[in-house]
Amino acid sequence: MNNQGKNIIVWAVIFVFVILLFNVFQSDGLLSSKNNISFSEFLTKVDEKTVNSVKIQGRIIEGTSNDGSSFSTYAPDYPDLVNRLNNNDVNIEVVPPETRMNTFLSFLISWFPMLLLIGVWVFFMRQMHGGGKAMGFGKSKAKLLSDKGPKITFKDVAGIDEAKDELTEIVDFLRDPSKFQKLGGKIPKGCLLIGPPGTGKTLLAKAIAGEANVPFFSISGSDFVEMFVGVGASRVRDMFEQGKRNAPCIIFIDEIDAVGRHRGIGMGGGNDEREQTLNQMLVEMDGFEANEGVVIIAATNRPDVLDNALLRPGRFDRQITVSNPDIDGREKILQVHLKKVKYSTKIVPRIIARGTPGFSGAELANLVNEATLIAARRNKKEVEMHDLEEAKDKVMMGVERRSMIMSDEQKKLTAYHEGGHALVGLYCLASDPIHKATIIPRGRALGMVMRLPENDRFSMPRDKMEADIAVAMAGRVAEEIIFGKEKVTSGASSDIKMATRMAKAMVTDWGLSDKVGPVYHGSASEDMYTNRNSSSDRSESTSELIDEEVKKIVTTGYDLAKDILTKHLDQLHILAKALIEYETLSGQQIKNLLSSRQLDSEEENNFPFGAASSTIKIAEEKDLKKAKPIKAKKEDKS
């Protein structure tokens, strides 16, 4: 039973005890039901002279008969009672009314609010600090991983082999330190896992816990600092003391950026408390006292905000980058997650891996789970390839909103908008191949053209950037050509935003503007935590020049898209008409449609396709017999 359940039982027992105590006191002040007689019967006995003596206590009368039996009764307001008793020779004893009950009630009424507040405060303090030690604010919240339950090992980790090898060495050191110490090697004091969200940093830590036969403590960076001053530093000290007592051991700090940010940034007591906590952590990790056998493993997706003193060797000796997996890594990750579900032997993980560039391990796990839910919803006995393809489209493009009712005019406008994207993407050879075009609303978009690269891309060439900007502007251009400038809509807002950001990065980050030159100007968002590279460092003339160059690049892409769509207006009409009729077209179907001006009967009977291979390069001259592909224009250097 957990601590919360035990606390509830304790308070329930206390409540029942108070109720019983109240009843005991109450019963003492009430008339006993033993030998109780009515007041009329009592008067009759008095008149018959069978009553020997009575004791009057308020309204309660207790008496003794001549035969020695006792009785009791409750008297109403009867002024002549004493005279009647005297006339019948009854011995009378009068005592004051019982005041014990009133005193107890008065005590409860006066002290109950204060006792209630104290009880609530103690209860919450016990909840905050582990069910005991009500004054143990400074105790560490690090949890020792239990041996119970299924263990995660390195076999469950795939796609990040380099990071796994680095951490395997640490596990081997903890298991057999003599192997390394005989050459004079020392165990690394700390290891920092760096990478975007979902790449498997926490999973690696769990795998280390499953592999290493040493105590494993886990804590979050946000668990150190709370509302009381000095609590964070105290918890850091207690955590390392706990580690020393269990050495050799591993302490895992997740999201260390919550406590390890740059010092001296910001103002206020909360910030001072965080800095005090960080200072204590720096001392404990590499101070005068040795922490032999205590290995710190931390994870963060914001290494840029961490304090430099925390990152130096001697504290975090190793910084391991856990990046998104490549195509081979994605295939291995899919195989790991597919083992946990019932799937068809016809599934080819390599095809799904090829169509999910940039996916993290968490996103691939979610994709497999979505495919499983889709198969279960359709009462299938196993997950099939089509379910994975549909789940991929759902994750990448959003959920289909088929219930959304679109007017014919809106549907036509969306078809030409998406057709413009697809056609320009088809003719810009530097652009990624088209995976799918649809006018079915998905997420917040009324339609979408999905393009996927043939292979993993680790850098982006300039001609692809220019092609992507042209493809982004093609939707707005298609609306202007078909419906006129006065009829254009706000549907291109996200496209314009994407094109502007790309152009700005070309000028300020990548030095691709001849006028601005290969100078890094950075973005204003970088000064959030570091106060470096702020846009305010630029001169006014430089900012104006950057704006001019950004506008020039976007306008060049706009002109390229307009040139392509104007020359191939007939193909735009064909593509838009097919989108209106079938709603969804794969890249291969668009290729066949524009090369032969018709669809094969087999394709026509299977609309809409769930997905098509994203590895088909569709902008080829032999496939487009009536149109010559146009390459993206280079930026005017004048």
UniProtKB/Swiss-Prot annotation:
InterPro entries linked to this entry: AAA+_ATPase, AAA_lid_3, ATPase_AAA_core, ATPase_AAA_CS, FtsH, P-loop_NTPase, Pept_M41_FtsH_extracell, Peptidase_M41
SMART domains, per database record: AAA
Domain of life, per lineage: Bacteria
Keyword terms, alphabetized: ATP-binding, Cell inner membrane, Cell membrane, Hydrolase, Membrane, Metal-binding, Metalloprotease, Nucleotide-binding, Protease, Transmembrane, Transmembrane helix, Zinc
Matches recorded under Pfam families: AAA (PF00004), AAA_lid_3 (PF17862), FtsH_ext (PF06480), Peptidase_M41 (PF01434)
Transmembrane intervals: 5-25, 104-124
Record localization: Cell inner membrane
GO biological process: protein catabolic process; proteolysis
Stretch list, region Disordered: 523-544
E.C. no: 3.4.24.-
Active site: 418
Cellular compartments per GO CC: plasma membrane
Gene3D superfamilies: 1.10.8.60, 3.30.720.210, P-loop containing nucleotide triphosphate hydrolases, Peptidase M41
Signal peptide region: none
Residues given in the record as ATP binding sites: 195-202
Top EC class of this enzyme: hydrolase
Record's cofactor remark: Binds 1 zinc ion per subunit.
PROSITE patterns listed in its UniProt record: AAA
Binding residues for Zn(2+): 417, 421, 495
UniProt membrane topology term: Multi-pass membrane protein
GO molecular function per UniProt: ATP binding; ATP hydrolysis activity; ATP-dependent peptidase activity; metalloendopeptidase activity; zinc ion binding
Cofactor needs: Zn(2+)
UniProt similarity note: In the central section; belongs to the AAA ATPase family.
Subunit structure: Homohexamer.
PANTHER family named in the record: ATP-DEPENDENT ZINC METALLOPROTEASE YME1L1, METALLOPROTEASE M41 FTSH
Name of protein: ATP-dependent zinc metalloprotease FtsH
